[in-house]
A protein has these predicted regions:
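Gly/Pro/Ser/Thr-rich low-complexity, intrinsically disordered segments predominantly at protein N-termini
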Residues: 1-225
Length: 225
């Protein structure tokens, strides 16, 4: 399914009240026991994730590493910051890929990713879909932004088209796929990678109810189109 981008209402994450310059933030965060993003002159606390959340990210990093080995591209996990500009905002996506020479020697953060991935959670979904995506869209090298549901086989891929517009392709899988059906293939065009959606959910027990609801919603929207 392909749809035009829609921006949801976005609550702000928990912020640190102290105002800091970008340089002060980068120095301050090095001394903290936890990770903090940065926007609007303030640091904000990063929330933890569930085991399925982490497993999905690990599975994707494994797929990307195997595919990109020897290409000169870097696959980075949730410990790597992305700077929208050298002065921020700064966010920690779950997975990112950069193939840009300017990121080759980066130490504290990258600035030129082609692919950014967020694994959704109840506490961050609105932020990931809203304000954070608006920030990411300012990165001129970004070609794809991907949102993955860790509790059901659902991958939303936003791609920048030739007209400079972001379009959504929604991939939905099911545990009930029969042996004669073709598996749903997720396409990440920014890194020229295609893989079955099931590969993202290896070693994860999914909710059959949520998967069924997603499929019914997708069929309903397809029929309306």
């Amino acid at each position: 399914m392909i749809a035009q981008l829609q921006t949801p209402t976005t609550p702000s994450p928990k912020e640190i009240s102290l105002l800091m310059s970008p340089r002060e933030y980068l120095i301050w965060e090095l001394e903290q026991p936890a990770k903090y993003g940065y926007m609007g002159g303030r640091a904000y606390a990063m929330s933890g994730g569930t085991i399925p959340h982490n497993q999905v990210a690990v599975n994707l990093v494994s797929l990307l590493n195997a595919h990109l080995r020897g290409s000169g591209c870097k696959t980075l996990s949730s410990d790597a910051k992305v700077g929208i500009t050298e002065n921020g905002p700064f966010h920690y996506p779950d997975v990112s890929v950069t193939c840009d020479e300017r990121d080759r020697t980066a130490r504290s953060h990258i600035q030129y990713p082609c692919l950014i991935v967020e694994v959704l959670s109840n506490s961050t979904e609105a932020f990931d879909r809203g304000k954070k995506f608006r920030h990411y869209r300012r990165i001129k090298t970004l070609q794809e932004y991907v949102l993955i549901d860790p509790d059901a086989m659902s991958v939303e891929c936003y791609r920048l088209n030739d007209r400079g517009k972001w379009e959504l392709t929604h991939y939905i899988g099911s545990d009930e796929t029969s042996s004669d059906e073709e598996p749903v293939q997720v396409e990440l065009t920014s890194v020229d990678l295609s893989f079955p959606i099931e590969a993202l959910y290896e070693n994860i027990s999914l909710s059959e109810t949520e998967a069924s609801e997603l499929l019914e919603t997708d069929r309903s929207e397809t029929n309306k189109a």
